[in-house]
A protein has these predicted regions:
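ABC ATPase NBD coupling module
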Residues: 34-41, 92-109, 133, 138
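Short helical segment in ABC ATPase nucleotide-binding domains corresponding to the A-loop/adjacent helical element
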Residues: 124-132
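ABC-family P-loop ATPase nucleotide-binding domain
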Residues: 1-40
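The feature captures the beta-strand-to-loop junction immediately N-terminal to the Walker
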Residues: 60-62
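Conserved ABC transporter NBD signature motif
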Residues: 83-91
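Helix-to-loop junction immediately C-terminal to a conserved catalytic motif
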Residues: 75
Length: 139
C-alpha cells in the first residue's frame, strides 16, 4: 500500500480583512462571485490533493492561478486561510516555526517560477545540489 506523503484538504488562501470569519459565515464554501463582491482576493480556492511517497508532482496552470501560493501554503511559507495540510501524517498547521524550518531544510523541496540552474552542472547535478550542500551521500 502506498503511503501519503502530503495531503491537502480544502485549502483556501483569501486576501482581505478577517478572511477566516468570511469563510465561516459562508459555511466554508463561498462561490467566486460572492468572494469578489465581498472585496476578497481569492488566491487558492478549496484546493485538495494527495501526493504519495515516491511521486513527483508538477503544478501547472496559467499565470496567477494560485500554483505558487498553494505550494507556499503547503510549506507554510505563507499561512493558509483554511484547510488541512498533513505531511507524513503530521498536521503542518500545528507545527512550530522550528519544525517548519527542519521540514523545509530536510524533507520538502520546491522549485518556483523564478529560479536559476548552474550552467556548469547537468540537470541531475542541479537537482542533487541541495543534498550535496547538506553532505548527503548521493550514492
Amino acid at each position: 500500500m502506498t503511503k501519503s506523503k502530503i495531503v491537502c484538504r480544502n485549502v483556501w488562501k483569501l486576501y482581505g480583512p478577517e478572511p477566516e470569519k468570511f469563510l465561516a459565515s459562508h459555511d466554508g464554501e463561498p462561490d467566486l462571485a460572492t468572494i469578489k463582491e465581498s472585496g476578497y482576493i481569492p488566491a487558492v480556492r478549496n484546493a485538495s490533493l494527495e501526493v504519495n511517497e515516491g511521486e513527483l508532482v508538477v503544478l501547472m496552470g496559467l499565470s496567477g492561478s494560485g500554483k505558487s501560493t498553494l505550494v507556499r501554503c503547503m510549506s507554510r511559507l505563507i499561512e493558509p486561510t483554511a484547510g488541512e495540510i498533513d505531511f507524513d501524517g503530521e498536521d503542518l498547521r500545528a507545527a512550530s516555526e522550528r519544525e517548519l524550518v527542519e521540514l523545509r531544510r530536510h524533507k520538502m523541496g520546491m522549485v518556483f517560477q523564478h529560479f536559476a540552474l548552474f550552467p556548469h552542472r547537468t540537470v541531475l547535478e542541479n537537482v542533487a545540489f541541495p543534498l550535496e550542500v547538506q553532505g548527503v551521500d548521493l550514492a
